[in-house]
């Protein structure tokens, strides 16, 4: 997605050869016009998948997931990372390891919002090692629902997440595929 790649080049900050900071438009401050374009792009790519639910993880996956849900006309469920007073019973749970934060957390969604008749699309902000996506897929499988694909805003193609998901048979659609962050420069996979 050209507009996203341009935004990464102009406003993204390479912190290391492994870490790209995009808090100017995605992870802290959110560019709503770009998010709307992202939602439309995900909707176009998955329009024939029969999606009934979009599943994401708090917090940075929520904005692109909401915009995709708006375009597709389907509800969005975000998995919580922390125990809540209002979300404590009848939960599907999975453990996920965050590459960026280097921590493991338990994510959860209520079993009242997803069931075996659902066709779910996973959407997340980044794909690195694939652990967040696999955790969300685990939650969907616990509900006996179908995973129709994984939509990623920014994929770090030099890390194993994409290959891991493809090997397990999942469709992966990434809007920006970063080939390298070497020498402080973002280069994209040529499609």
Curated annotation (Swiss-Prot):
Kindly report the protein's main subcellular placement as a broad class: cytoplasm
Task: Supply the name of the protein.
Answer: Xanthine phosphoribosyltransferase
**InterPro entries the record matches:** PRibTrfase_dom (IPR000836), PRTase-like (IPR029057), Pur/Pyrimidine_PRTase (IPR050118), Xanthine_PRibTrfase (IPR010079)
What one GO molecular function would you report for this record?
A: xanthine phosphoribosyltransferase activity
EC number(s) stated in the UniProt entry for this protein: 2.4.2.22
Positions that bind 5-phospho-alpha-D-ribose 1-diphosphate: 128-132
Query: What is the annotated localization of this protein?
Result: Cytoplasm
Q: Which UniProt keywords apply?
A: Cytoplasm, Glycosyltransferase, Purine salvage, Transferase
Q: Read off the CDD domains from this record.
A: PRTases_typeI (cd06223)
* Organism, as annotated: Acinetobacter baumannii (strain ATCC 17978 / DSM 105126 / CIP 53.77 / LMG 1025 / NCDC KC755 / 5377)
């Amino acid at each position: 997605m050209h507009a996203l790649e341009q935004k990464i080049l102009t406003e993204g900050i390479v912190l290391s050869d492994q870490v790209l900071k995009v808090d100017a438009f995605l992870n802290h401050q959110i560019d709503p016009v770009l998010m709307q374009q992202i939602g439309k792009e995900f909707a176009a790519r998955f329009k024939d998948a029969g999606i009934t639910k979009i599943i994401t993880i708090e917090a940075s996956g929520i904005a692109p997931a909401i915009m995709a849900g708006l375009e597709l006309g389907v509800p969005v469920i975000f998995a919580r990372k922390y125990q809540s007073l209002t979300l404590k019973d009848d939960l599907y749970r999975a453990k996920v390891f965050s590459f960026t934060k280097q921590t493991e957390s338990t994510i959860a969604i209520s079993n009242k919002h997803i069931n075996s008749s659902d066709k779910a699309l996973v959407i997340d902000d980044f794909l690195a090692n694939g652990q967040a996506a696999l955790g969300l897929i685990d939650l969907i499988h616990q509900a006996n629902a179908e995973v129709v694909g994984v939509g990623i805003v920014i994929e770090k193609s030099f890390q194993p997440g994409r290959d891991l998901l493809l090997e397990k048979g999942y469709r992966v659609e990434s809007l920006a595929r970063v080939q390298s962050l070497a020498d402080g420069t973002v280069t994209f996979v040529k499609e």
